[in-house]
Amino acid sequence: MKTVLRMIGLLLGLAVVANVGFVAFVAARGIPSYAPPKPALAQVLATPERLAQGEKLVLAACADCHLNRETGALSGHQLRDVTPDFGAVYASNITQDNVHGIGTWTDAELVGLLRTGIGRDGRYRVITPKFVHMSDEDVASVVAFLHADNAMAQPGPTASHPQEPSLLLKALSNTVMKPVLLPTGPVGAPTLTDAVAFGRYLLVGRYQCFECHSKDFKTNNALAPEKSDGYLGGGNKLLNAQGHEVVSRNITGDPGTGIGDWSEAQLGQALRFGRGPNGPLGAPMPKYSQLTDAEVHALYAYLQTVPKIKNATPEDGVLASK
């Protein structure tokens, strides 16, 4: 018996030492850096169609974090809706400023960042969405817009604030929240004629709704979004501008706790104007005002196919029993 107890004590001691060592390693290493990605890409041609699509995508997928509402420029600010568990997180200046922004970045370098989260300096932007499933054409449209003459993208001499990651975010960036690789081949988008497939593309590829509306940022799966814990079942904890906790909504088709009893028109009102069947939707839920009727239809069609999850969030009037 004494031998067994000694062995247990030894194993516990080794576990403590290992944990202390890991914490010390993570604290010292911080957010890791990587070799900059090298996508095979010629210069993006800025066609009128790409500039229009790029503006739509930047407004929907980038501006919420990077747009300074006072100046109208994509010069960045603190992301106050990110849980304090991750520390203080700041969106960078992505204007065309040559010193503080992306004015000297090539098209390929921007594509590498958008796809993987790794910048040309090798620094990993751990909170930045990784647009793994966005089509090559949509990515090119974003790049074209960021290098265009639009006022949002014009040089803004605001220095990007250094990140202040917590120990938790440092640990996650060294374990489960790592960068993703560049696609190994062309990435296309389904056509609007296949509403379900196109709706999935919008939700997963363009707008990444699953990131907030699945259970937890820490267990989301960028490469295989449907494998994210609690896919689209809500319960993820965010903050509003006042620092109050907001729990993401269950957007599966469960009629009791999700949006199974919503009509297509009601979904469109919620997405475009922030008005749900029971009242206004609070921040940080963005308003996708430029969604077309066909896109709303596709999103609605896809959401009908997602496995239902029974998960009541506070917005539903009752606390979840998880």
Located regions from the model:
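N-terminal type II signal-anchor transmembrane helix
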Residues: 1-34
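C-terminal capping alpha-helices of c-type cytochrome domains
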Residues: 23, 106-119, 130-156, 263-277, ...
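Electrostatic cytochrome c docking/interface patches
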Residues: 31-59, 73, 174-204
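C-type cytochrome heme-c attachment and multiheme electron-transfer modules
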Residues: 118, 176-192, 197, 245-276, ...
